[in-house]
Amino acid sequence: MQVKLFYTLALWAPILVSAQLSGSVGPLVDFKTKAKNKTCDITDYGAVADGKTDVGPAILDAWGNCSTGGLIYVPPGTYSLATDLELKHGESTAFQLDGVLARGHEGSYQLILVRNCHDCEFFSGNSQGAVQGYGYEYLQDGNYGERLFRFQDVSDFSVHGFAAIDSPAYYLVFDTVSNGEIYNLLVRGIADLGMTDAFDIWGQNVWVHDIEVTNGDECVTVKSPASDFLIENIYCNLSGGTAIGSLGTGTNISNIHYRNLYMNQADACYLKTHNGDGIVKNIVWENVIVHRGPYPLAVNEAWGKDVGSTGVQVQNLTFRNWYGENTANSRPAIRIECDEDVPCYDITLDNVNLWTEDGDYVEWSCANAYGSGACLQEAKDTGDLATYTTAVTVTATPSYSATHMPGDFTTNPPSTAPFTIPPMPTSFYPGATPISTLLSLSGAGGL
């Protein structure tokens, strides 16, 4: 159901849901209306929930008949998916995944591609749907397979209510999307290998909320170009954490609001680039809890491969109400290191309380960054900013209490066996229930 931002939003979300959104998000027509119009049950097209028979042809046939104005239904059960799916040119359509799609072949690119879809919804009606990637078959040997999902050129959409399990590579990529809502999702996989990003998103006007991630790389990451994102109630539970980047040439990111972030052995902010170009501006991170993050708060403009351009202009970043600790005080708890040719400015640290579980001091590191808080220098004139580098050692322990989530992992999941599909979480931030209630439908569209 589309969320209208001019409502009081009592039925949908907190009043401040529009913090960085520029308009309405979500499908224009609800899934029940689509199901009433036309329903395509994949078992009517030859699908068998035996975990062996390839369900791909049945899904493609159902999509062909219901991708305009209808609902494609995957009933409960386990289905083998041995065909890469390209679900394209959907118009006012819904895909209800109440069963499990288990990867059944060795593909090389994308297991499920949803492309050029308008007014579409990909969801689980019983909150038990899942895609099982069996990624351990690759990752235990240091190899990679295909990605689970890619949503490309999708508008007025929602994705919600299911689990993405043990991907052989990336999990969910949202490529050039707009007016979308992404929520009530669980990612669970091997937590010690990179190139396993959970959510990579770029586009315009997107609301991401109530997400839990366990993986070996980035948790919820904004890529360029992106504008008008609200990202809240995020639980990175053994993960790289929430990031911006990495950023190359032509960067254009603005009006991104992260709030209510809970990090267990993950980082809440890692903005990374190395001699790219373009701009990052108007970004907020607030209400953040970090436990054992390697780099809890980091802006690093010398990260990775040198792209060879003039540097990304970073401006107007706000970090507000942060609590927690890093893993080792040999790494700065606060690191804001900007390009000497394009210094950062208008950076604000407000009530940021970061300590360490390793020792009796923390380091702050700042370079070519201007604003207020920590080791930042103040700027009288942003038109002429000098270069500088400074490090501060802090020995005074901040006074704060940072709660823990009961589901925090303390050890990495095994990497040599299939994952059991867990139930959908009922909380993604301490003391908070999901903004949108988990669905418990019986049958297609809940009819």
From Swiss-Prot:
EC class of the enzyme, as a word: hydrolase
Disulfide feature: 40-66, 219-236, 338-344, 366-375
A GO molecular function held by the record: polygalacturonase activity
Catalytic activity, EC: 3.2.1.-
GO biological process terms held by the UniProt record: cell wall organization; polysaccharide catabolic process
GO CC terms: extracellular region
Pfam families (alphabetical): Glyco_hydro_28, Pect-lyase_RHGA_epim
Localization terms from the record: Secreted
Transmembrane regions listed in the UniProt entry: none
Annotated function: Pectinolytic enzymes consist of four classes of enzymes: pectine lyase, polygalacturonase, pectin methylesterase and rhamnogalacturonase. Hydrolyzes alpha-D-galacturonopyranosyl-(1,2)-alpha-L-rhamnopyranosyl linkages in the backbone of the hairy regions of pectins.
Family note: Belongs to the glycosyl hydrolase 28 family.
Protein name in the entry: Probable rhamnogalacturonase C
The organism of origin for this protein: Aspergillus oryzae (strain ATCC 42149 / RIB 40)
